[in-house]
């Protein structure tokens, strides 16, 4: 179990982004699990019931928009906060994120600390150096416009 006791599911197909975001989240004491595509993300969300999901939008098999809709329409996962992580940075993309059920929105590239800040907004503060035991690495930065 992690120092915060909170689990974040990171749905991201880019290995560099997964390493950065998972590393910094673990540094702040969150347990991080990972999925490489929308289909795997949906399955892990349903089986593991994470406290929060960081959802890349441009992912294979099922994109992040559709995966979010599936999770928000499922009674078992609808209350899990989902933060969109996307290179789609237009105002219309932010609106679409909210329409499909995302609870937060971060435009890439984003500073690792911005990701942490956004996660903390939903889950509370973890402390630096309070790393959990899960493997992986990542950096995140908080921001919500």
Name each model-derived stretch.
Residues 15-33:
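Two-component/phosphorelay signaling modules centered on CheY-like receiver
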Residues 34, 59-62, 91, 99:
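Residue-level signal for the "D+5" position in two-component response regulator receiver
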Residues 48-54, 59:
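Active-site beta3 strand of CheY-like receiver
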Residues 110-119:
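C-terminal output helix
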């Amino acid at each position: 179990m992690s120092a915060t006791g909170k689990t974040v599911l990171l749905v991201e197909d880019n290995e560099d982004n997964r390493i950065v975001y998972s590393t910094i989240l673990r540094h702040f004491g969150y347990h991080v699990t990972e999925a490489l595509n929308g289909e795997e993300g949906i399955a892990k969300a349903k089986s593991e019931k994470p406290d929060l999901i960081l959802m890349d939008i441009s992912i294979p098999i099922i994109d992040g928009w559709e995966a979010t809709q599936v999770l928000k329409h499922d009674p078992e996962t609808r209350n899990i906060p989902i933060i969109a992580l996307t290179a789609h940075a237009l105002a219309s993309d932010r609106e679409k994120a909210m329409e499909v059920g995302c609870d937060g929105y971060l435009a890439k590239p984003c500073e690792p600390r911005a990701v942490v800040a956004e996660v903390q907004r939903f889950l509370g503060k973890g402390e630096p150096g309070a790393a959990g035991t899960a493997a992986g690495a990542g950096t995140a930065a908080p921001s919500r416009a």
